UniProtKB/Swiss-Prot annotation:
UniProt keyword terms in alphabetical order: Amino-acid biosynthesis, Cytoplasm, Glutamine amidotransferase, Histidine biosynthesis, Hydrolase, Lyase
Organism per entry: Prochlorococcus marinus subsp. pastoris (strain CCMP1986 / NIES-2087 / MED4)
Superkingdom field: Bacteria
Active-site residues, as the UniProt record annotates them: C81 (nucleophile), H185, E187
Main location: cytoplasm
Domain (Glutamine amidotransferase type-1): residue spans on this chain: 3-205
InterPro entries: Class_I_gatase-like, GATASE, Imidazole-glycPsynth_HisH
GO biological process: L-histidine biosynthetic process
GO cellular component terms attached to this protein's record: cytoplasm
Protein's UniProt name: Imidazole glycerol phosphate synthase subunit HisH
Length: 205
């Protein structure tokens, strides 16, 4: 059993993520300052809400440098929903710079005549390449989304799965070495979400 640090900065779906991980019999530490990180084997950055308030709240915890150093050192890290978006350089939603850990931008989901924004509901993951959480030919994995913005990484090779949005494809998951992140909510995605969390936990270094 690995100690998993769940970053608590006032913008997260803390309760539901904690409950999901505890159901997998994992030990969770709520991280509110950098002194609590040292005992963790992996970190999760969850998030629900808007980009600028999230960056401001994260800044108040004084954890930003620690998060960057954590990822740079090769330790396991998972971003969830807004937690994925904060990893990027900027967002159409706000004016404050993101963490810049992943090159690219967060863009407003395009308005399509046959689709609604926010993009809410169950959608099938479409794997794009080999990765730690999904096999390339693994289909019928439905997960739950709630978002109005989507990630556009500068390097498309970071994308490990997309989701269909009308005629468009939106980024659903990214992976780079020890860093993984998903736009959907695995903690609200039933058996598929549980499976993906188990695989992430198994990958913890």
């Amino acid at each position: 059993m690995a100690k998993i640090g769940l970053i608590d900065y006032g913008m997260g779906n803390i309760h539901s993520v904690t409950k999901a991980l505890e159901s997998l019999e994992e030990e969770i530490i709520l991280i509110k300052n950098n002194h609590q990180i040292k005992d963790c084997k992996a970190l999760i950055l969850p998030g629900v809400g808007s980009f600028d308030p999230a960056i401001n709240n994260l800044s108040k915890t004084e954890l930003i440098i620690d998060i960057k150093n954590w990822i740079k050192s090769g330790k396991s890290f998972l971003g969830i929903c807004l937690g994925l978006q904060l990893l990027f350089e900027s967002s159409d939603e706000g004016t404050i710079n993101g963490l810049g850990i992943v090159k690219g931008q967060i863009k407003k989901i395009p308005q399509l005549s046959d689709q609604r924004i926010p993009h809410v509901g169950w959608c099938e993951l479409l794997p794009t390449r080999k990765n730690s959480l999904l096999k390339v030919d693994e289909l019928n994995n439905w997960v739950y989304f709630v978002h109005s913005y989507h990630a556009v990484p500068s390097n498309n090779n970071l994308i490990t799965a997309n989701v269909s949005y009308g005629s468009e494809k939106l980024t659903a998951m990214i992976e780079r070495d020890n860093l993984m992140a998903c736009q959907f909510h695995p903690e609200k995605s039933g058996k598929t979400g549980e499976k993906l969390l188990r695989r992430w936990i198994k990958s913890i270094q």
